[in-house]
């Protein structure tokens, strides 16, 4: 059976393939091979650049261009050839090394230095840099732009709904009012913090041999400062150098990276659930699309499927990421292979998140505020004014203020008349009575509408 979006086992490459297609060039087997091939080529070029020390003097500029073309022109036919070599070697990096050696054999001058391909390297020297660059590209080209889009969309919602009063619910029960804009601002601020953190996370790489000590390098060329060469090579990719490792780069930065992503995802799950709840309360309506169907049997249904889809995929993403957070920083002694299969699922974890990000944006785009329902719910809950009344009573030294309001309001149907009658009975200045009577569930919103003007 040919592999298509219909025959793929994973919905990442099946049902949701249109949402994850940009990740294929990065996290597919083809992508992984190309990243690793590039590192092998760049390492060979680095060796060539040390020609005066290593006595390599016959490599011309055209050969350097040829090496670059091997990466630039890398295609599926090349990838299949590497996989066929791997069937014999049962070792992916060795297969890649043999492929590159076969390629450079086309050049007489490069053929003379073919044994400098993969010189001094352990497989992890190549793999760890590849993963670093894959994560960097995914972050800079896909994840952060989507986060920015979500955050920017929330910011627009903040000011669009700045003056829409909202009955707050603590423990699911009526509480001091806010505004819809302020409640969205809470999520905006939380997500923006994670955006800034993710952008600044240092992505690390290493190239220092089998156990991190340049043993083979120094055996061949003891007078060369391989530590400095390692640093120069790693930083040339725009990533940070880890000078102290075992055979593997310890993956702490991946744990940091996914900790940030997982927290952003968790905040977004919180947002999805709140939006789901507001839709359920009829605070938001969803724009309908004529040809869409909400239920196979209930024709009237318009379900919040985008927020539900987003929540579900974020859960899957976090499950994988949280496993990686606790698994990847641990390796037995100088290394064990249990991280290898886990690392190959980095793209899967990110893919579920990307699906979720697109879903939440789709859901937000369908929302329409239902102001009448917001006001209707507020009007049913005049008892929330017990908070400002008892607070002002305390200001004027009235004893048992809290207890008196508790007796008046708790578990009872309270309306405007009941509240105003109670206010009239208070021994406080008439101006304060007037101010209290001007308070309603609709305008008792504190500074909710003002403080959001300070968001950046």
Swiss-Prot record:
GO terms for molecular function: (S)-2-(5-amino-1-(5-phospho-D-ribosyl)imidazole-4-carboxamido) succinate lyase (fumarate-forming) activity; N6-(1,2-dicarboxyethyl)AMP AMP-lyase (fumarate-forming) activity. It catalyses: N(6)-(1,2-dicarboxyethyl)-AMP = fumarate + AMP; (2S)-2-[5-amino-1-(5-phospho-beta-D-ribosyl)imidazole-4-carboxamido]succinate = 5-amino-1-(5-phospho-beta-D-ribosyl)imidazole-4-carboxamide + fumarate. N(6)-(1,2-dicarboxyethyl)-AMP binds at residues 15-16, 90-92, 122-123, 247, 296, 301-303, 309, 335, 340-344. One of its GO terms (cellular component) is cytosol. It comes from the Bacteria. Pfam families: ASL_C, Lyase_1. The active site is at 171 (proton donor/acceptor), 295 (proton donor/acceptor). Pathway: Purine metabolism; AMP biosynthesis via de novo pathway; AMP from IMP: step 2/2; Purine metabolism; IMP biosynthesis via de novo pathway; 5-amino-1-(5-phospho-D-ribosyl)imidazole-4-carboxamide from 5-amino-1-(5-phospho-D-ribosyl)imidazole-4-carboxylate: step 2/2. PROSITE patterns: FUMARATE_LYASES. GO terms for biological process: 'de novo' AMP biosynthetic process; 'de novo' IMP biosynthetic process. Keywords: Lyase, Purine biosynthesis. Gene3D superfamilies: Fumarase/aspartase (C-terminal domain), Fumarase/aspartase (Central domain), Fumarase/aspartase (N-terminal domain). Its EC number is 4.3.2.2. The keyword S-adenosyl-L-methionine does not apply. The keyword Cell division does not apply. Belongs to the lyase 1 family. Adenylosuccinate lyase subfamily. Catalyzes two reactions in de novo purine nucleotide biosynthesis. Catalyzes the breakdown of 5-aminoimidazole- (N-succinylocarboxamide) ribotide (SAICAR or 2-[5-amino-1-(5-phospho-beta-D-ribosyl)imidazole-4-carboxamido]succinate) to 5-aminoimidazole-4-carboxamide ribotide (AICAR or 5-amino-1-(5-phospho-beta-D-ribosyl)imidazole-4-carboxamide) and fumarate, and of adenylosuccinate (ADS or N(6)-(1,2-dicarboxyethyl)-AMP) to adenosine monophosphate (AMP) and fumarate. This is Adenylosuccinate lyase. The gene is purB.
């Amino acid at each position: 059976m040919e592999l298509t979006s219909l025959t793929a086992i994973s919905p990442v490459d099946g049902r949701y393939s249109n949402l994850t297609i940009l990740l294929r060039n990065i996290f597919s087997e083809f992508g992984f091979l190309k990243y690793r091939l590039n590192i092998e080529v760049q390492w060979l070029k680095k060796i060539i650049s040390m020609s005066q020390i290593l006595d390599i003097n016959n490599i011309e500029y055209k050969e350097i261009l040829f090496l670059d073309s091997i990466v630039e022109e890398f295609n599926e036919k090349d990838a299949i050839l590497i996989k066929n070599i791997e069937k014999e070697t049962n070792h992916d990096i060795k297969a890649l090394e043999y492929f590159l050696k076969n390629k450079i054999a086309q050049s007489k001058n490069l053929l003379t230095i073919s044994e400098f391909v993969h010189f001094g390297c352990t497989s992890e020297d190549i793999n760890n840099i590849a993963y670093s660059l894959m994560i960097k590209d995914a972050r800079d080209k896909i994840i952060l732009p989507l986060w920015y889009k979500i955050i920017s969309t929330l910011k627009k919602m903040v000011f669009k709904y700045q003056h829409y009063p909202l009955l707050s619910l603590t423990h699911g029960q009526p509480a001091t009012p806010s505004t819809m804009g302020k409640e969205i601002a809470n999520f905006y601020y939380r997500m923006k913090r994670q955006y800034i953190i993710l952008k600044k996370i240092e992505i690390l790489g290493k190239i220092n041999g089998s156990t991190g000590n340049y043993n083979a390098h120094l055996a061949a060329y003891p007078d060369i400062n391989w530590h400095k060469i390692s640093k120069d090579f790693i930083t040339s990719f725009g990533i940070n150098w880890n000078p102290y490792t075992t055979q593997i780069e310890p993956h702490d930065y991946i744990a940091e990276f996914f900790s940030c992503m997982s927290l952003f995802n968790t905040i977004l799950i919180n947002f999805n659930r709140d939006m789901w709840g507001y839709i359920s309360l009829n605070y938001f309506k969803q724009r309908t699309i004529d040809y869409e169907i909400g239920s196979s049997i209930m024709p009237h249904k318009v379900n919040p499927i985008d927020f539900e889809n987003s929540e579900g995929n974020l859960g899957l993403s976090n499950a994988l990421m949280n496993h990686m957070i606790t698994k990847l920083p641990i390796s037995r002694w100088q290394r064990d292979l249990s991280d290898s299969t886990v690392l190959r699922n980095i793209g899967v974890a990110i893919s579920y998140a990307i699906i979720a990000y697109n879903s939440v944006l789709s859901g937000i785009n369908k929302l329409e505020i239902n102001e009448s329902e917001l006001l209707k719910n507020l009007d049913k809950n005049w008892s929330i004014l017990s908070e400002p009344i008892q607070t002002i009573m305390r200001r004027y030294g009235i004893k048992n203020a809290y207890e008196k309001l508790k007796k008046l309001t708790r578990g009872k149907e309270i309306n405007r008349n009941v509240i105003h009658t109670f206010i009239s009975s208070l021994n406080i200045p008439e101006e304060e009575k007037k101010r209290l009577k001007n308070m309603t569930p609709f305008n008792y919103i504190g500074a909710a509408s003002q403080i959001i003007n300070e968001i950046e």
